[in-house]
């Protein structure tokens, strides 16, 4: 995410102009833009004049800059688009409804009261644009998966299966060649790569890849895991391989925090989960780290019930981490009620 303007008052009210550059940035914006915000962006809208009313099928869409008072936000991951719907307050057809389609590369400005976690999201996305992406490759005999580490979770890029038949050596070389081709195609030149899997297949692949593209292989990190697929990718994250590449990786941090939370739950230790337990812990000033699922935060924020709790945590020197429900730790947190806390002391 590229930030081009910050104009905020001491109470965090004001305008930030920015440009999303990736699908991750659009996901962040889903939780930054909320009902009541004023969002400006270039958009296309049919000109509303007398001639057009007589011949509506002839009306042409013009590119105009509109300011929309937000009523609804939808993230369409598979079309790489964020849809911001609301009432036009500035520009042509004020008083009518319009939907802004925000894609990567769209310049927009957001005027609102900025909550602390929303500013942290902007800062995180801006910093992430300067860090390398990570590509995960999980290989076992006959099967391989390639995935991207995203802010919202792991996105499977491709699954490769070795053909069966005679000439096992040749088929294995074709299998490795396909993996290497897919990996090369997935890279733009700035990513880091982790190759993982059980047994020696990954090592054999690395030898093959080295013979074909030694420059690419030189920067690859190799990790042992017990499986491939999504569970293998999760194992790579838990082992800290991604953390060693991106120290501030959102996903690695959430995995580590969820492991700590589950250990405390198993020990009946310094932990609270579910809204009632967490509220009680906040009242006692016991919360060290508040864990909130993004969907829970959005829903509670719409009802106006959660910001006071967050402020109380911050006043007692606690911190908050928002989990993505697109990713396994966030899904686990959702199953625990969408909110939990690691405590300073047992309540």
Swiss-Prot record:
It is found in: Cytoplasm. It comes from the Archaea. Its EC number is 3.1.-.-. InterPro entries: eFR1_2_sf, eRF1_1_Pelota, eRF1_2, eRF1_3, Pelota/DOM34_N, Pelota_arc, Ribosomal_eL30-like_sf, Transl-rel_pelota. This is Protein pelota homolog. Its cofactor is a divalent metal cation. SUPFAM superfamilies: Dom34/Pelota N-terminal domain-like, L30e-like, Translational machinery components. Monomer. Belongs to the eukaryotic release factor 1 family. Pelota subfamily. May function in recognizing stalled ribosomes, interact with stem-loop structures in stalled mRNA molecules, and effect endonucleolytic cleavage of the mRNA. May play a role in the release non-functional ribosomes and degradation of damaged mRNAs. Has endoribonuclease activity. The gene is pelA. Keywords: Cytoplasm, Endonuclease, Hydrolase, Metal-binding, Nuclease. The N-terminal domain has the RNA-binding Sm fold. It harbors the endoribonuclease activity. SMART domains: eRF1_1. One of its GO terms (molecular function) is endonuclease activity. GO terms for biological process: nonfunctional rRNA decay; nuclear-transcribed mRNA catabolic process, no-go decay; nuclear-transcribed mRNA catabolic process, non-stop decay; ribosome disassembly; RNA surveillance. GO terms for cellular component: cytoplasm. PANTHER family: PELOTA, PROTEIN PELOTA HOMOLOG.
């Amino acid at each position: 995410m590229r930030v081009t303007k910050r104009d905020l008052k001491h109470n965090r009210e004001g305008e930030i102009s920015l440009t999303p550059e990736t699908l991750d940035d659009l996901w962040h914006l889903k939780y930054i833009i909320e009902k009541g915000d004023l969002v400006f962006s270039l958009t296309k809208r049919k000109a509303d004049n007398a001639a057009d009313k007589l011949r509506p099928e002839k009306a042409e869409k013009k590119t105009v800059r509109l300011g929309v008072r937000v009523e609804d936000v939808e993230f369409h991951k598979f079309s790489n688009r964020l849809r911001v719907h609301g009432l036009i307050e500035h520009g042509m057809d004020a008083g009518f409804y319009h939907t802004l389609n925000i894609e990567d590369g769209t310049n927009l400005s957001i005027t609102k009261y900025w909550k602390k976690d929303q500013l942290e999201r902007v800062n995180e996305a801006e910093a992430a644009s300067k860090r390398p992406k990570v590509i995960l490759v999980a290989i076992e005999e006959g099967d391989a998966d390639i995935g991207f580490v995203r802010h919202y979770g792991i996105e499977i890029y491709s699954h490769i299966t070795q053909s069966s038949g005679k000439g096992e050596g040749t088929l294995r070389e074709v299998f490795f060649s396909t993996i290497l081709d897919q990996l090369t195609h997935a890279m733009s030149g700035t990513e880091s790569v982790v190759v993982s899997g059980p047994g020696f297949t990954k090592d054999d692949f690395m030898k093959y890849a080295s013979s074909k593209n030694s420059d690419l292989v030189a920067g690859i990190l190799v990790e042992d895991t017990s499986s491939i697929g999504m569970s293998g990718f999760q194992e790579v994250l838990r082992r800290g391989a991604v953390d060693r590449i991106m120290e501030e990786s959102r996903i690695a941090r959430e995995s580590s925090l969820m492991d700590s939370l589950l250990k405390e739950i198993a020990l009946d230790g310094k932990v609270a989960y579910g809204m009632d337990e967490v509220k009680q812990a906040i009242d006692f000033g016991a919360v060290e780290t508040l864990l909130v699922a993004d969907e829970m935060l959005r829903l509670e924020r719409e009802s106006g019930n959660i910001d006071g709790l967050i402020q109380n945590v911050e006043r007692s020197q606690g911190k908050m981490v928002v989990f993505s429900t697109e990713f396994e730790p966030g899904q686990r947190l959702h199953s625990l009620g969408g909110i939990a806390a690691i405590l300073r002391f047992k309540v």
